Amino acid sequence: MSYFKNIPSQQSLVHHASVSLEPCSSSHYIELKRMHYNEENTEKTWDMIKSLDSVAVLLYEKESDCFVIVKQFRPAIYARHFYFKFDQDQNIDGYTYELCAGLVDKANKSLEEIACEEALEECGYEISPKHLETIGQFYSATGLSGSLQTLYYAEISANLKVSKGGGIDTEKIEVLFLKRSKALDFIADFQYAKTTGLSLAILWHLKKFKNIKNV
């Protein structure tokens, strides 16, 4: 079954022999913390990670009747399968299918502005905050970091495409066009590693715009 208008790359860009893991004593993105607290006269502790919040946007291109999503290598997913769980039998290579997204790391910019920047950098569409509709805000990794993600939706057209996308600096992001008519089947297919935000945003769209006819 073909879920995509374009064909996703089947070849990993990561050399398995080059991968190694080591303890992390410091990071620009996370801090390891331990909370001490009293709950109903019981002293407790909880280890957690201080991390940045994020934004993500579901892009829907009208002409193609497709959701524009991204595929990229996630080291944590790779390590989970090959180092922590040792379940190499699963069809997981560390690449995940996700919404266009980014960290909230620019104090002088609004969440909407950051979301628009990510749409341009990752997918090549130049949109503005007026294009965005808020889907909602959701906490992720509630037992580990409690980071907050704000989800947006934007209806786009081909004339907003100004570059091929793919990310900036050393990012290797693949832009994919997921057929709206196949989106539910894609969500249910466990052979494709995907994020909760991607599935939630697509389900939100399909419910809100259930009367849209396929192009």
Predicted regions and their residues:
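A contiguous pocket-lining binding segment that forms or flanks enzyme active sites
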Residues: K109-E155, D169
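Active-site-adjacent beta-strand/loop module that shapes the phosphate/pyrophosphate-binding cleft
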Residues: E31-T42, A141-V162
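Short loop segments at secondary-structure junctions
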Residues: E40, E61-S64, F73, A154-L160, ...
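A broad, low-specificity signal marking well-ordered, structured residues that form hydrophobic/aromatic
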Residues: K33, W46, V68, Y97, ...
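A positional/architectural concept
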Residues: M1-E63, F73
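Conserved Nudix-box catalytic region and its N-terminal flanking loop in Nudix hydrolases
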Residues: W46-I49, L58, E63-E117, Y139, ...
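Nudix hydrolase/Nudix homology domain
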Residues: S2-V19, Y95, T134, L144, ...
